[in-house]
Amino acid sequence: MLDGNRIAIVEEGFEDSELAEPMRALKNAGTKVVLVGSGSQDIYRGKRKKMEIKPNVKADEVSAADFDAIVIPGGYAPDKMRLHQSMIDLVRDAYNSGKIIAAICHGPQLLISADIVQGKRVTSWSSVAIDLRNAGAIWVNEPVVQDGNLITARKPADIPKFNKTIIEALRAIYGTSADT
């Protein structure tokens, strides 16, 4: 089992499955999932209105040292997350500390704002590709891409492989086993 704190960050309009399924996989692997919000509201709703989430904590109340990984769901949320410096700083600091940063679909928009994609192989929803390239990333059309501590995926259909890659990366760091 994987022990420790992993993190999912959330904002209004997240893609429901891109938050729910990684959370479930991480919990099933034995991690403690902490939901971090921007603080813009008390309850965040999924884009498809299937989920309502109350964050455990606000981004300006935590630091990268509190967590082992960050998972960024897609949907409309990443574009809103970019408006909050505390969210950007948390992602940048975690990345610079060698923590796993995993983003799916539109999630890499936040990676652009955190200025951590320069020279990195990444993937995303196809409409985000030009933004990633303009930020200096090497965009590829593959289901899941890992470049160092950065893991990216394209879309909801890629979630099973995305989850497996996150858990394998955490297992490689912490030397424990986990089932997805």
What are the roles of these predicted feature ranges?
Residues 104-106:
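Short, thiol/selenol-centered motifs that function as redox-active sites or metal-ligating centers
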Residues 122:
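Anionic-ligand binding patches
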Residues 119:
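Exposed beta-strand and adjacent loop surfaces of beta-rich binding modules
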Residues 1-97, 101, 110-116, 129-180:
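Extended, subdomain-level signal for the structured scaffold at the beginning of enzyme domains
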